[in-house]
């Protein structure tokens, strides 16, 4: 949850998007709806949104085009396999507001998009990348008496890993059996985001007492990669996102619920502070009346 400690932190979430939900994800990200349940979206500001990669067709059509061009492979996938994922890059609203707002946010997320290309494995696997600049931060707007917007970046992509296809025993040339027939980019969310061995300073795997390697959650690796990329790009005044989270892959709904809960916690804290201040004022007035 939000810490409210005044420290600016990078954050990136990896969301699993089902085939059933991808249409709604597209409508939300590309602002194709006539109305939205999220009251923070200001339609008059939609023109301020910035595409770093604009989709030339629907997300599902783009996926089909990648498959037809053999850029990706779905061979052997289960019927309920996840074909799409979404990265949501974020920093608290105050960070951008303190650096001038919109123009700074555009540059920051242009660099974040470059990080996304590395994380995903290539721009060809990205279906859409758009910075939203039309969602207002109501808490800050109310506190500062002017409009403050919450800038963040949505990147929808196809999760892939390199896979070698070997010649089978049915091959007529027995010398080829077991050798590499072709290399494909296999669609696989689970393998793309598998936990990785934790390495020591010398680059060797850290082992448990039983001799097995200590695994580092893919969520933690993702946070590290984004933070390190942005630091290298010159953003030295931000800190890494929260550590120790057991969170791996949130669904879009779970992510939105979490963000709303963070905002609610922030507003509740502000309300508590105001209540305490009001109580102190009332006590002071009461004492003066008794005098």
Task: Go through each PLM region and give its residues.
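N-terminal nicking endonuclease/strand-transfer module with a His-rich metal-binding environment
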Residues: 1-290
């Amino acid at each position: 949850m939000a810490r409210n400690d005044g420290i600016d932190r990078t954050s990136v979430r990896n969301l699993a998007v089902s085939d059933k939900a991808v249409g709604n994800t597209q409508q939300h990200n590309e602002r194709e709806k006539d109305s939205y349940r999220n009251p923070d979206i200001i339609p008059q500001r939609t023109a301020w949104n910035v595409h770093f990669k604009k989709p030339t067709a629907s997300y599902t059509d783009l996926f089909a085009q990648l498959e037809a061009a053999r850029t990706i492979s779905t061979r052997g996938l289960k019927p309920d396999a996840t074909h799409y994922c979404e990265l949501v890059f974020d920093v608290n609203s105050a960070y951008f507001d303190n650096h001038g707002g919109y123009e700074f946010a555009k540059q920051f997320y242009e660099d974040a998009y470059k990080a996304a290309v590395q994380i995903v494995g290539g721009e060809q696997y990205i279906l859409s990348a758009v910075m939203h600049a039309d969602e207002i931060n109501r808490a800050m707007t109310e506190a500062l008496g002017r409009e403050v917007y919450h800038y963040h970046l949505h990147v929808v992509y196809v999760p892939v890993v390199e896979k070698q296809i070997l010649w089978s025993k049915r091959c007529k040339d027995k010398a080829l059996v077991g050798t590499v027939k072709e290399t494909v980019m296999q669609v696989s969310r689970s393998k793309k985001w598998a936990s990785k061995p934790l390495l020591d300073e010398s680059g060797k795997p850290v082992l448990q007492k039983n001799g097995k390697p200590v695994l580092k959650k893919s969520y933690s690796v993702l946070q590290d990669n984004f933070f390190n990329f942005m630091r290298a790009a010159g953003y030295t005044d931000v800190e890494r996102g929260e550590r120790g989270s057991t969170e791996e892959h949130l669904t879009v709904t779970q992510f939105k619920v979490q963000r709303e809960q963070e905002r609610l916690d922030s507003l509740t804290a502000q309300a508590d502070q105001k209540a305490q201040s009001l109580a102190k004022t009332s006590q002071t007035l009461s004492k003066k009346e008794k005098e």
